[in-house]
Structures are given as structure tokens and as C-alpha cells.
Amino acid sequence: MIPGEYQIQDGEIELNAGRRTLTLNVANSGDRPIQVGSHYHFFETNDALVFDRALARGMRLNIPAGTAVRFEPGQSREVELVELAGLRRVYGFAGRVMGEL
């Protein structure tokens, strides 16, 4: 193996198999671009993003790890969210949960 080399298996890989998902319409009401990473608790994103926050509690973007979605000022788009896994405890981010979901 060469350092940094990828050895990719043939076929498809299904991300987040079996987890509940949700599609939301999200609008950037601000005057600056907002980028949200793959594992950010979507409920706690920038307040300039307008969407049903209650539905997004305990969820993150359903995109590959290490990637992000960018919302330009005035832009509205649909995003798919997936429920958080593991112990379902959320600490940090914007400090709106700080414990179990």
C-alpha cells in the first residue's frame, strides 16, 4: 500500500442505512453565505437560516463526512437531514441543547 492510497471495493455504499431522514426547505435570510458541515447539529445552525427548527432537533445533514452545504444570501434549497446516532447527546455547537436529546 502506498501512503494515502485508497483501496475502494466495487459496488455501492449506502450511507446512514436504516436511520430516519427528513427533507426540509431552508432559506438564508442573511447577507452573508452560511456553510454547514456534515456533522453539525442542524437545529443549532446560524439563526439567519430559516426553517422548522423543532423538526431538525437531533438531526444533521445527510451528506458524506467531511463535506458541507453552502447557503448563499437569499438562497432557498431543500436539504435532507438524518438523525444523529450513538448516545444522542449533544454538547457544544451553539449551546442550545448541552445534553441528551
Swiss-Prot record:
Keywords: Cytoplasm, Hydrolase. GO terms for biological process: urea catabolic process. GO terms for molecular function: urease activity. GO terms for cellular component: urease complex. It comes from the Bacteria. It catalyses: urea + 2 H2O + H(+) = hydrogencarbonate + 2 NH4(+). It is found in: Cytoplasm. It is an enzyme of class 3 (hydrolase). HAMAP family: Urease_beta. Belongs to the urease beta subunit family. This is Urease subunit beta.
